[in-house]
Design a protein with these regions (language model features):
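C-terminal capping/extension of enzyme domains
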Residues: 1-29, 154-171, 189-264
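Internal, well-ordered interaction modules that form the hydrophobic cores of assembly/scaffold domains
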Residues: 174-193
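Short, solvent-exposed loop/turn segments at secondary-structure junctions
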Residues: 65-69, 142-146, 187-191, 229-234
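A polyanion-binding, active-site-adjacent surface
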Residues: 2-177
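Structural motif
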Residues: 61, 181-183, 225
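A short helix->loop->beta-strand "cap" motif at the edges of active sites that frequently abuts
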Residues: 57, 178-180, 218-222
């Protein structure tokens, strides 16, 4: 556990005490991936690695990187950069903070449908932050904010090694808390885990939509990978798909998952 938490603390200290070096580091990562304009990582926001109560969350969502909202992000930043203790408390209780401030997010609205279907809970949409606080932890592959993001389909050696190191650090951290389901969201995960053979075996789910799902296990933990961002409506994914079709495919594959989520 100490490795990732130490990495997060060192990153926070760099951001707090040496802004110039922090900006150079973040810019170098943007340069590594050839990112331009709004896709470049923001150098004036502290990194966000783990969001939610990771010790207890049964569902872990692995994303690409934290996004950016003109309304929400400056408020988040003001809270996170007050102190190291405040940073930890803020991201641990992130969903409660969003609930208290009545924040809205298209991503989390789409995620409410998916988690409602997976957990079989009856949290209404207006109480989605309570659902996330009880069930969800987000872990970012790249911890820096950006307005958009587009990574190469084929990774060079430097890009692959950076992403592999971050993936291993995240997995080694979260596996000790024994979550019940891991979800990998986005094309980069197919590029990294499947195309680069970081997982030994996987099964492609039957699916008529314009994206693919892959099932596998990591240390016995049920895992699912979406090769596109599941929250994007233009891919032909509907809210009914998120609440019913996709959860059914996952539960059909991992028959004990419903029971495991109920036991939390």
């Amino acid at each position: 556990m100490a490795d990732l938490l130490q990495e997060i603390r060192e990153e926070y200290q760099l951001y707090t005490y040496d802004q110039l070096q922090y900006k150079k580091k973040v810019n170098s990562i943007s340069d590594m991936f050839g990112l331009k304009q709004k896709n470049r990582f923001k150098t004036d926001y502290c990194a966000a690695y783990v969001i939610g109560r990771f010790q207890f969350a049964p569902i872990v969502m692995f994303g690409l990187n934290p996004g950016y909202s003109m309304r929400n992000s400056p408020i988040e930043e003001n809270e996170a950069n007050k102190s190291w203790q405040n940073y930890q408390n803020f991201y641990l209780n992130f969903f409660r903070y969003f609930s208290h401030n009545k924040f809205e997010s298209p991503y989390y609205t789409a995620l409410w449908y998916l988690l409602s279907g997976l957990t079989g809970t009856n949290f209404p949409k207006k109480r989605k932050w309570e659902l996330f606080d009880q069930y969800l932890c987000n872990i970012e592959l790249i911890p820096y904010h950006s307005e958009g993001i587009m990574l190469p389909d084929i990774l060079n050696k430097e890009q692959f090694e950076y992403l592999q190191e971050r993936y291993i650090s995240n997995i080694n951290f979260i596996r000790q808390f024994k979550p019940k389901l891991l979800i990998f969201n986005g094309k980069v995960w197919k590029t990294l885990l499947i195309n680069r053979d970081l997982i030994e075996q996987h099964i492609e789910a039957p699916n008529a939509k314009q994206f693919r799902m892959y099932f596998f296990e990591l240390d016995g933990i049920p895992s699912v990978l979406f090769d596109r961002f599941f929250q994007r409506h233009f891919l032909g994914i509907t809210n009914d798909d998120r609440m019913f079709t996709i959860p059914k495919l996952i539960h059909d594959r991992f028959e004990n998952l419903s029971h495991d989520l109920e036991k939390r």
